[in-house]
UniProtKB/Swiss-Prot annotation:
Keyword Cytoplasm in record: yes
E.C. code: 3.5.3.6
SUPFAM superfamilies, alphabetized: Pentein (SSF55909)
UniProt name for this protein: Arginine deiminase
Gene Ontology, cellular component aspect: cytoplasm
Active site: 400
The species this protein was found in: Halothermothrix orenii (strain H 168 / OCM 544 / DSM 9562)
Alphabetical UniProt keywords: Arginine metabolism, Cytoplasm, Hydrolase
GO molecular function: arginine deiminase activity
Amino acid sequence: MFKKSPLNVTSEIGKLKKVLLHRPGHEIENLTPDLLERLLFDDIPYLKVAQEEHDAFAQTLRDNGVEVLYLHELAAEAIQEDEIRKKFIEQFLDEAGVIGKGARQVLKEYFADMDNETLIRKMMAGVRKKEIPAIEKVASLNDMVEEDYPFVLDPMPNLYFTRDPFATIGTGITLNHMRTETRNREVIFAEYIFSYHPDFKDTEIPFWFDRNETTSIEGGDELILSDKVLAMGISERTDAASIEKVARNIFTDGQPFETILAFKIPEKRAFMHLDTVFTMVDYDKFTIHAEIEGPLKVYSITKGDNDELKIDEEKATLEDTLKKYLGLDEVTLIRCAGGDYIDAGREQWNDGSNTLAIAPGEVVVYNRNHTTNRLLEEHGIKLHVIPSSELSRGRGGPRCMSMPLVREDI
């Protein structure tokens, strides 16, 4: 007998009750300048300070009544059974590209005596070759060819951006297929949590998207504007075809959602996901990066006849489109740093538009984006300001670093 889904997120701004985070770990200290591009980082955060900043973020949430869960703990609890643990290790090594016979065997032996939490942390951190016994060079050609590479298992430094590998929508999730091989490895943790964790395994959680799909989607491109309207980004990381798949699944499942607004944003690093340039902070207020307003196209996706999708390009301004679909008389777009070319460019690079709402009109923001923060306050938004000198080096803000599991309905 399946139990009711323990998930419930029907807005961006409903009071946040439960959230999933990942505290940065030793994966950050396995970054080197030579590996930054491969691992999708622009800089190397100082781990000690990054952890202090992340702890301040988590405490801010707790102080406001939010239950904070951690990714490594849930993942460890999901693989308690021996057969599931063995399956998890084999799949993890497959997805990490550990194909050399020697490397694979040595890693399995290395993992064998670890408890589950230590195992998960080590998988996240990556394994340097000098940590393990020498790989027999006769084991495989692949092992010999890769002998100069410092890792037998790459680190996963993007994990503290828990927003992207999966996304809670309503009572279900999209289990995402991420654009890059580096980040697609992260999805395995969510896969096992929702399949095998005691809190989730026997519950009715619909999957709006499956990670085995061939097109890409990432959680930073998935926003819930109301219990009837979703916003999704067609971006550097999310394909239009993926949005159509989500739409078909949601519209045929009896969920309350009636419309998906698909935002086509420029494909560039600074605008990686929709939530780096557009977030909801109150019933009728949104942050936006002014640079996307010109080239922005918005398409509405609704349920058509015979279970087909009806797709139209919205010709009105963004304000009018939002008013139309959200049933609002007025909409306020709060431009990152007021739209000033220099200030907005700087603050958007440090996620000035990437806010996390914990209640209507109440958001968590980075302290470094002082111009945008002042504008938010001038528009009546209550701010919870967190330190950000090191966390921001990963190119993600408070929304990127959090995956809501439960919000109050509004």
